[in-house]
């Protein structure tokens, strides 16, 4: 997964956190797999538009260096996560605060997400009509909670979850 030439400002140059304000981040079909290491993209007052599959590079699991495990997060604040009908596989953390997760058009394709989804996902279910065999793991939308989030947490993600859980607790 290559960084766009200009993604916006990096609020923490010591980690792979990229922030884009008042613009959309578009993932195109020819995007390369997410390579070794963790990274977080924060999109504020814009949308994450996913037009192609997002996958992890096949990196051997190394118990001596968790930082090599590919891991990615997208946090959208005051915007939506839009998923094209041709997208069938996503990997990573997809979070929207004050927005929705939706399909850009109707699709009869299944969608498999390896990672974590946080936000209003109901509109996405309304756009997908695939009917598979649930006993074979062929749901319309299948979310597999991936352990890499715990081994190599994308930077900034822990702080976002701590803030959100504190707000829920109050």
Model-derived segments and spans:
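Predominantly polar beta-repeat domains that present long G/T/S/D/N-rich surfaces used to bind, process
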Residues: 82-170
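Primarily marks folded extracellular/lumenal domains of secretory and cell-surface proteins
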Residues: 1-82, 149, 155-170
């Amino acid at each position: 997964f290559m960084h766009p030439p200009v993604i916006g400002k990096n609020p923490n140059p010591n980690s792979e956190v990229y922030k884009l304000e008042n613009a959309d981040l578009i993932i195109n079909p020819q995007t390369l797999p997410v390579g070794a290491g963790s990274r977080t993209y924060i999109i504020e007052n814009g949308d994450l538009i996913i037009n192609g599959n997002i996958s992890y590079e096949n990196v051997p699991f190394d118990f001596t260096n968790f930082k090599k495990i590919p891991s990615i997060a997208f946090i959208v604040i005051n915007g939506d996560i839009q998923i094209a009908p041709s997208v069938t596989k996503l990997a990573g953390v997809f979070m929207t605060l004050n927005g929705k997760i939706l399909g850009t058009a109707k699709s009869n394709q299944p969608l498999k997400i390896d990672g974590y989804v946080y936000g209003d996902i109901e509109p996405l279910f309304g756009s997908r009509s695939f009917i598979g065999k649930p006993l074979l793991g062929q749901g319309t939308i299948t979310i597999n909670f991936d352990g890499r989030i715990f081994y190599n947490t994308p930077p900034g993600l822990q702080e976002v979850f701590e803030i959100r859980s504190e707000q829920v607790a109050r």
